[in-house]
């Protein structure tokens, strides 16, 4: 019996020696840190994040924002708030001293609106490339530099391959953009992780032709981005915010369709006000009510037995005028983030957009 135990220990020690030899050989060949034990350095497990500018969305994402060193996809219909959400993330990154870049493939960035959202234009790197290849090459160079914290590419649909630009107007080039994206993401994904750069791809929605069952909606650029993205956000405009007869903002719903760093399928709603961006005060009222921090009785809202307004808009205005109370409510909401996360859990289900072959025919939404 003891003989078997001794031989087992011997086998284990031989296995350990063989493993140590293999690890040292890998480190000699590919450099120190190319392979390591996951639990040895706990900082490796920690995922750094950048706030989205929305308190509710930060809670829904599970790590306090969008993860750094990962690929993010934000998609939705036109005028749903995709670029606004990306610019708010850029503004939050700049507040903490981050370097941000914006690859404007659509040639549609409004610098005045970006400034209103809090983006420091003097520190923002911007590129307006002519072709999809040029845009992705610029993105690759910026990521490899290791000096950029957040890189936004707006949008995947506007990354037109050079062959398509040089061809005739009616030429059929199926799958060309999908192949371009697939090759670029294979090249980018390793350097994104090493440089700890967050790359946000903004994408548009198309309708698949001839779909009888399920949603006909899909995103442009093939399937590669769906696989490589660690977080996918589906953003929709669900209503208008009016001041008397004038529309002053949009009610917006964001669903976390995919999340590799925390449980997915949570969804949040917030207001995007024109010329202001995501309404922080509106979120404090809504999330505070869900967590029981802000009491609601009829149409009246109150905090610590003090009435703060009749109706949601009046409560928002009261918090704008009383920043100390707003800060107190925000701190209480952050302390109860786990409870709120449970309340905003959506019904689990698969991604609504079906798989898209490289050569699928697409029609504009």
From Swiss-Prot:
Specify residue ranges for compositional bias: Acidic residues. 353-365
Instruction: Give the start-end ranges of region Disordered.
Output: 346-365
Kindly state which keywords UniProt assigns to this record, in alphabetical order: ATP-binding, Cytoplasm, DNA damage, DNA recombination, DNA repair, DNA-binding, Nucleotide-binding, SOS response
- What CDD domains is this protein classified in? RecA (cd00983)
Disulfide partners? none
Residues bound to ATP? 76-83
What family is this protein classified in? Belongs to the RecA family.
Instruction: Tell me, in a sentence or two, what this protein's role is.
Output: Can catalyze the hydrolysis of ATP in the presence of single-stranded DNA, the ATP-dependent uptake of single-stranded DNA by duplex DNA, and the ATP-dependent hybridization of homologous single-stranded DNAs. It interacts with LexA causing its activation and leading to its autocatalytic cleavage.
Protein name as it appears in the record: Protein RecA
Q: Which gene encodes it?
A: recA
């Amino acid at each position: 019996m003891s003989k078997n135990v001794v031989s087992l220990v011997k086998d284990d020690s031989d296995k350990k020696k063989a493993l140590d030899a293999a690890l040292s050989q890998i480190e000699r060949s590919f450099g120190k840190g190319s392979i390591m034990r996951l639990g040895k350095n706990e900082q490796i497990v920690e995922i750094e994040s950048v706030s989205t500018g929305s308190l509710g969305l930060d809670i829904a994402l599970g790590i306090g924002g969008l993860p750094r060193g990962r690929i993010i996809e934000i998609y939705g219909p036109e005028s749903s708030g995709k670029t606004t959400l990306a610019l708010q993330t850029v503004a939050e990154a700049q507040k903490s001293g981050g370097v941000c870049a914006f690859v404007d493939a659509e040639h549609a960035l409004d610098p005045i609106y970006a400034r209103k959202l809090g983006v420091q234009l003097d520190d923002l790197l911007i590129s307006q490339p002519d072709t999809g290849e040029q845009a992705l090459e610029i993105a690759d160079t910026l990521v490899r530099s290791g000096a950029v914290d957040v890189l936004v590419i707006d949008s995947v649909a506007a990354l037109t391959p050079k062959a398509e630009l040089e061809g005739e107007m009616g030429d059929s080039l199926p799958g060309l953009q999908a192949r371009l994206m697939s090759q670029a993401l294979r090249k980018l994904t390793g350097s994104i992780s090493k440089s700890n750069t967050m790359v946000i791809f903004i994408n548009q929605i198309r309708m698949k032709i001839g779909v009888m069952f399920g949603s006909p909606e899909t995103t442009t650029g093939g399937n590669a981005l769906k696989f490589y993205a660690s977080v996918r956000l589906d953003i929709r405009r669900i209503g208008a915010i009016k001041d008397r007869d004038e529309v002053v903002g949009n009610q917006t719903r964001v669903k976390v369709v995919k999340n590799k760093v925390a449980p997915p399928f949570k969804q949040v709603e917030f207001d995007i006000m024109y010329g202001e961006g995501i309404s922080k005060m509106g979120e404090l009222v809504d999330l505070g009510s869900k967590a029981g921090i802000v009491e609601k009785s009829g149409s009246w809202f109150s905090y610590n037995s003090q009435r703060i307004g009749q109706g949601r808009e009046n409560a928002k205005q009261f918090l704008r005028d009383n920043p100390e109370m707003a800060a107190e409510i925000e701190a209480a909401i952050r302390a109860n983030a786990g409870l709120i996360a449970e309340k905003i859990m959506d019904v689990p289900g698969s991604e609504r957009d079906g798989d898209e072959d490289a050569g699928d025919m697409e029609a504009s939404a």
